[in-house]
Amino acid sequence: MYAVIVTGGKQYKVAEGEYLKIEKLEVATGESVTFDRVLLVANGDDVNIGAPVVAGATVKAEVISQGRHDKVRIIKFRRRKHHMKRMGHRQWFTEIKITGIQA
């Protein structure tokens, strides 16, 4: 059984027992989270597609950790001007474990 959920402006295909890094949620480590924006639920050949969401479907998850991704380095360069600007960015994430899918 798997589902497609929306969180942080992105869509994720999830299955029970899976670990996932999503955009940061303001939830403490160890607490549970419920996602109610479920776009699709599939159990074998039985596929339920929402319009836009599946009514009554939820995905439950447990927060494992909070952290930051590796640094992404950005360089802005102006040709022929001997000018270069170096920057970096580290995005926050929340790691979750999918504990249940209810359709």
Swiss-Prot record:
GO cellular component annotations of the record: cytoplasm; ribonucleoprotein complex; ribosome
Disulfide bonds listed in the record: none
Keyword Thylakoid tagged: no
Keyword vocabulary terms for this entry: Ribonucleoprotein, Ribosomal protein, RNA-binding, rRNA-binding
Pfam families linked to this entry: Ribosomal_L21p
GO MF, one annotated term: structural constituent of ribosome
Keyword Nucleotide-binding: no
Oligomer status and interactors: Part of the 50S ribosomal subunit. Contacts protein L20.
Function: This protein binds to 23S rRNA in the presence of protein L20.
PANTHER family: 50S RIBOSOMAL PROTEIN L21 (PTHR21349), LARGE RIBOSOMAL SUBUNIT PROTEIN BL21M (PTHR21349:SF0)
Family: Belongs to the bacterial ribosomal protein bL21 family.
NCBIfam families linked to this entry: L21
Protein name: Large ribosomal subunit protein bL21
Lineage, highest ranks first: Bacteria, Pseudomonadati, Pseudomonadota, Gammaproteobacteria, Pseudomonadales
Gene name in the database record: rplU
